[in-house]
Amino acid sequence: MRKITQAISAVCLLFALNSSAVALASSPSPLNPGTNVARLAEQAPIHWVSVAQIENSLAGRPPMAVGFDIDDTVLFSSPGFWRGKKTFSPESEDYLKNPVFWEKMNNGWDEFSIPKEVARQLIDMHVRRGDAIFFVTGRSPTKTETVSKTLADNFHIPATNMNPVIFAGDKPGQNTKSQWLQDKNIRIFYGDSDNDITAARDVGARGIRILRASNSTYKPLPQAGAFGEEVIVNSEY
């Protein structure tokens, strides 16, 4: 009788252990939460466009002036800004107010910047159209600069299309790019920041968003499409 009781107990224990194992196997793991096709297919409801679609929208229109922001729009320039922060103000953003940093950034540190592929495609398209190309940046102006040559060389911009970089600077409470866009009669302006889009709208230009790379040192990342503007797909690189 004792052997029968022990056998029944062993069977019950084995069944309980097996049930626990099945339950554990079928329960979601916090380390492996999984996903589903609905989540994978989910897209933000914003106005996505491609470079080809932008080009098509300009078909039949005469050459015009177009503008680009620089940092995180045509260049991934975080390496220079990272070095500037580490060198001049590791614990704060004060390096951005340091003229020595801007002298270095505008005179050579863009050699460490990576040209963005989306910028290459856009600039090639506008060169084919015969558009005048401007770069309007919020960087502080310096007595000398090599940024214009770096951009012309990296993106193979002919002298007939290229214009010297405009250093609009940064003034609290003021969008310093707006007046420059108006003065140069820029009809399309590409940028990664909210200020780029609002500057274009201030002067009746077409503002088109380029995505800022998620590993940019410029945080927080902006909410692309928040103004209803066009946002270029795959433009983070």
Swiss-Prot record:
Keywords: Hydrolase, Magnesium, Metal-binding, Periplasm, Signal. Its cofactor is Mg(2+). It catalyses: a phosphate monoester + H2O = an alcohol + phosphate. It comes from the Bacteria. Its EC number is 3.1.3.2. It is found in: Periplasm. Substrate binds at residues 137-138, 177. Its main location: periplasm. Mg(2+) binds at residues 69, 71, 192. GO terms for molecular function: acid phosphatase activity; identical protein binding; L-phosphoserine phosphatase activity; magnesium ion binding. Gene3D superfamilies: HAD superfamily/HAD-like. CDD domains: HAD_CBAP (cd07499). The keyword Hydrolase applies. Optimum pH is 6-6.5 with 5'-AMP as substrate, and pH 5.5-6 with 3'-AMP or pNPP as substrate. The active site is at 69 (nucleophile), 71 (proton donor). Residues 1-25 form the signal peptide. Homotetramer. NCBIfam families: AphA. Belongs to the class B bacterial acid phosphatase family. This is Class B acid phosphatase.
